[in-house]
Each structure stands twice: as C-alpha cells, then as structure tokens.
Amino acid sequence: MKTSMFLTLTGLVLLFVVCYASESEEKEFPKELPSSIFAADSDFKVEERGCLGDKCDYNNGCCSGYVCSRTWKWCVLAGPWRR
C-alpha cells in the first residue's frame, strides 16, 4: 500500500514537472513575467484618482464627479446620498 501511494505521488510530481517544463519553454516564463507585471500595473491607473481625498473649500472646487464634503473639507464622490 505504501509503495503504490509513493509511486502514484512520484508519478504525479513527474507529470507536473514535465508539463511545467514544456510550458516554460513555450512562453519563456522567467523573461516575460516582469514585463507582464508592469504592463498590468499601468492598466489600473486612473486619471482622477488623485482628486479623491484632496483638501478643498467651496471656492476651490474638486474634479468632475466629486464634491467638497461639508464636514471633512475634502473631495468625496458625488452621489444621490450626498446633499
């Protein structure tokens, strides 16, 4: 029983290693990984993100889509729950 479990586990590990090696040859995984991380990072940048939480007053407005909070005096998202 122990021998068959050991052989099964060894076979699965060997299958995993062979599959991983064939995929890494096709994709050149170590070379493409850093470039794919930095490419995905640039997709998440939003232009108006810096406006949220900025200090404001009624003379100095916020970006479009944001309003100045009366209590906290910073830019917050405009919505139907805001007065």
UniProtKB/Swiss-Prot annotation:
Q: Which GO terms describe its molecular function?
A: carbohydrate binding; ion channel inhibitor activity; toxin activity
Q: Which cysteines are joined by disulfide bonds?
A: 51-63, 56-68, 62-75
Give the matching InterPro entries: Huwentoxin-1, Huwentoxin_CS1
Which keywords does the record carry? Cleavage on pair of basic residues, Disulfide bond, Knottin, Lectin, Secreted, Signal, Toxin
Q: Which PROSITE patterns match?
A: HWTX_1 (PS60021)
An example Gene Ontology CC term for this record: extracellular region
**Prodomain residues:** 22-49
SUPFAM superfamilies xref list: omega toxin-like (SSF57059)
Q: Where in the cell is it found?
A: Secreted
Q: Which Pfam families match?
A: Toxin_12
**UniProt tissue specificity:** Expressed by the venom gland.
Q: Where is the signal peptide?
A: 1-21
Indicate yes or no for the key word RNA-binding: no
**Domain comment text?**
The presence of a 'disulfide through disulfide knot' structurally defines this protein as a knottin.
Q: What does this protein do?
A: Agglutinates erythrocytes.
Protein family membership: Belongs to the neurotoxin 10 (Hwtx-1) family. 51 (Hntx-8) subfamily. Hntx-8 sub-subfamily.
Q: What is this protein called?
A: U5-theraphotoxin-Hs1a 5
Tell me which species this is from: Cyriopagopus schmidti (Chinese bird spider)
